[in-house]
Amino acid sequence: MQLLMCGHNEESFYLEYSRINQFFLHIVNMNDTFGPGSNLQKRLINDQEKLKATVESLKMLGMKVVLTQGVYDLIHEGHAAYLEKARSYGDILIVAVDSDELTKIRKGPKRPIVPQAERVNMLLHLRHVDLVTIKEAQHGLGDIIALVKPDVMVFSSSTTDVTPDEAKGYEQYCGKIEILPPQGTTSTTARVRNLTIEGAETLAKEVSELITKFLDQIKAS
């Protein structure tokens, strides 16, 4: 049987065929990323065009995409609870992780404590994180948001980078803004401060013991 098509009907047929073909390609791509045979590194997407295409594929499959950003240095239970809550707003959670260079700019020259590669791998091992991308120093606060155009953008109320009113301004790129309070009783900054204090106390004790030992040796000579 020969299918006769002409004019507008022929164009519509090929458009529909292309759409269906793309749909099945998206399914294959998603299985490669999230299926049983996938590995952690397939869920780390640094190429912006690939990230954009992946998000478009997810949305075509009817999935609700959630985006959040942060350093995730010295990951603790507050981070895990925050990411779990963020994931509850949709089907796929994308985490944009600040690079080492960006973290130094934002947090100071002694940060991060944990290097970028390790922070990324820790996040990829968390069950509520689906995709991870790196936010580089040249990226503005809204660059990743504008690229991904998430259905839901999640901010932490503890962030110093953006006020709640400024956060609402990003609604032009996404469907909804959610601002979450801290989900734990500790913070990375507090932990770093405690480690610094403990380190200083230990060093002071060791120096004191060395001085005492040195003075005792002088007295005995």
Describe each model-derived feature in a short phrase.
Residues 3-6, 13-221:
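Nucleotidyltransferase catalytic core that binds NTPs
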